[in-house]
A protein has these predicted regions:
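Primarily the dimerization/phosphotransfer
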Residues: 1-33
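Short conserved segment of the HATPase_c
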Residues: 167-179
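Short alpha-helical segment of the dimerization/phosphotransfer core of two-component systems
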Residues: 54-59
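Short helix-loop "hinge" at the ATP-lid/N-box region of the Bergerat-fold HATPase_c
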Residues: 135-136
């Protein structure tokens, strides 16, 4: 068996395990409600329905990430490049994420002369959504996600930071790998597929960018976690060449 076949089998095995957990919860709570509807009070009914909703959302997220991974591995995965402004894209994402994480705050800091980026808009939006949603998900209650964007030389830099539990330097690369989960008290409580950052890194690199993470302790219990996205500023000639090849 070659590496590709082994990687595919490992992927299917892990995905099957990840899918089984929410499906088991949905089936279990559905069966309980069907068999004991008259015995359950309104509070428990609402509680069970809420759990079913949460696990359904988790299942949808898993399936979307699995499809994204499959597309990444396909040689036919196409990119449609255009020059876009970052700010309206970020503002649109925040409006969506705020609806899911209503106790979280968001601070934006964009330089006045921020250059445009030459990217596939849908895939770039997926990158930013993963980073901003990830920050909100792993922030403490009432936490703040800070988003900063500026031009540095021939790069557009976008930083997404929040306060959270420290990520050790030895785990910096690990968190961008498939199905990676860093073991700490917060990640044990937060459900995730372990695919989001892998997809984010893969899409970033396919569009010529780079992504990194840094964790700086600020006290005994919290660190400032910053994900830095670097996207190249393309000249007119580079844009034309990329357009011809898409």
């Amino acid at each position: 068996m070659d590496n590709n076949e082994q990687n595919y089998e490992d992927f299917i095995s892990t995905v099957s395990h990840e899918l089984r957990t929410p499906l088991t919860s949905i089936r279990g709570f559905s069966q309980t409600m069907l068999s004991s509807w008259d015995k359950l009070d309104d509070e428990n009914k609402k509680k069970f329905i809420k759990i079913i909703e949460q696990q359904s959302n988790r299942l949808i997220n898993l399936i979307e990430n699995m499809l994204a991974v499959t597309k990444l591995q396909s040689t036919n995965n196409s990119f449609i490049y255009n020059e876009i402004d970052i700010k309206p894209v970020v503002e649109q994402i925040i409006a969506i994420v705020k609806n899911q994480y209503q106790d979280q705050k968001f601070e934006l800091n964009f330089s006045q002369n921020l250059s445009k980026v030459f990217v596939d808009k849908d895939k770039f939006q997926q990158i930013l959504t993963n980073l901003i949603e990830n920050s909100a998900k792993y922030s403490p209650d009432g936490g703040t996600t800070k988003i900063k964007a500026y031009t540095a030389g021939e790069q557009v830099i976008l930083e997404v930071s929040n306060l959270g539990i420290n990520i050790e330097e030895k785990d910096y690369e690990k968190i961008f790998t498939k199905f990676a989960r860093i073991d700490n008290p917060l990640t044990r409580k937060v459900q995730g597929s372990g695919l989001g950052l892998y997809i984010t890194k893969s899409l970033t690199e396919k569009m010529g960018g780079k992504i990194s993470v840094k964790s700086v302790p600020i006290n005994e219990t919290e660190s400032e976690i910053t994900f830095t996205l670097e996207m190249p500023i393309r000249s007119i000639e580079e844009q034309a060449r990329i357009k011809c090849n898409q």
